[in-house]
Amino acid sequence: MADDLDFETGDAGASATFPMQCSALRKNGFVVLKGWPCKIVEMSASKTGKHGHAKVHLVGIDIFTGKKYEDICPSTHNMDVPNIKRNDFQLIGIQDGYLSLLQDSGEVPEDLRLPEGDLGKEIEQKYDCGEEILITVLSAMTEEAAVAIKAMAK
């Protein structure tokens, strides 16, 4: 019976988000808008009306797609804030549009897609020239994306 259990693929049960009161959110911070992890680019608060609470108007840009999302919530309500991790990994290969990155543990995951646009072209160009580069990977809410590159320190 106990031999049937497989714990290798589980996580520690950590939540992908944590609650924060709407009035405590700040511009350039992060928040979940319409189910997407976003960076807050605009924020405005309205005064308490005759019927109800002060409201906070949030405008955010999705950290993965760049799409714009808006939401309005009472300042006393809680909003979800995504747990965001930012890590640098050494690029060791590109195959079929996916990056092979060397992690600190020595593992080499090959499931991160090469970003589209200028960043993807720059990564390919530097890799083809034989440059050693670090890829900055942003992780939030079970999604990952390469967001920046930098030269490796010699």
Curated annotation (Swiss-Prot):
Lys-50 undergoes hypusination, a unique post-translational modification that consists in the addition of a butylamino group from spermidine to lysine side chain, leading to the formation of the unusual amino acid hypusine. eIF-5As are the only known proteins to undergo this modification, which is essential for their function. One of its GO terms (biological process) is positive regulation of translational elongation. Keywords: Cytoplasm, Elongation factor, Endoplasmic reticulum, Hypusine, Membrane, Nucleus, Protein biosynthesis, RNA-binding. It holds the Pfam family eIF-5a. GO terms for cellular component: endoplasmic reticulum membrane; nucleus. Gene3D superfamilies: 2.30.30.30, Nucleic acid-binding proteins. It comes from the Eukaryota. It is found in: Cytoplasm; Nucleus; Endoplasmic reticulum membrane. Belongs to the eIF-5A family. Translation factor that promotes translation elongation and termination, particularly upon ribosome stalling at specific amino acid sequence contexts. Binds between the exit (E) and peptidyl (P) site of the ribosome and promotes rescue of stalled ribosome: specifically required for efficient translation of polyproline-containing peptides as well as other motifs that stall the ribosome. Acts as a ribosome quality control (RQC) cofactor by joining the RQC complex to facilitate peptidyl transfer during CAT tailing step. This is Eukaryotic translation initiation factor 5A-1-like. The lineage of its organism: Eukaryota, Metazoa, Chordata, Craniata, Vertebrata. The gene is EIF5AL1.
